[in-house]
UniProtKB/Swiss-Prot annotation:
Record SUPFAM superfamilies: Ribosomal protein S20 (SSF46992)
Protein name per its UniProtKB record: Small ribosomal subunit protein bS20
Pfam families, per database record: Ribosomal_S20p
Record region (Disordered): 1-25
GO terms under biological process: translation
Annotated signal peptide: none
Gene name as annotated: rpsT
Length: 90
């Protein structure tokens, strides 16, 4: 246990931020899962709309420091490529 008041406060803040960050990360993963499910179902329109929403959530998470910007770019790029491949198959 921390002995200084400032350290105790810092620990409380860390725990609070940890819960918030976990929630945000889980929310982003949910949006990514929606995109993946739409791609697997072969529904291009739904996948594109889901990707747009997921991209927004990912960008916000990157701004908050939950994901690095390169990670966000990589995820969006890979999902966009999969959606493009759906178009090519049709």
């Amino acid at each position: 246990m921390a002995n200084h008041k400032s350290t105790q406060k810092s620990i409380r803040q860390d725990q609070k931020r940890n819960l918030i960050n976990k929630s945000r990360k889980s929310n982003v993963k949910t949006f990514l899962k929606r995109v993946t499910l739409a791609i697997n179902a072969g529904d291009k329109k739904v996948a594109s709309e889901a990707l747009s929403a997921a991209h927004s959530k990912l960008a916000k998470a990157a701004n908050k420091g939950i994901f690095k910007l390169n990670t966000v770019s990589r995820k969006v790029s890979r999902l966009s490529r999969k959606i493009k491949q759906l178009e090519d198959k049709i």
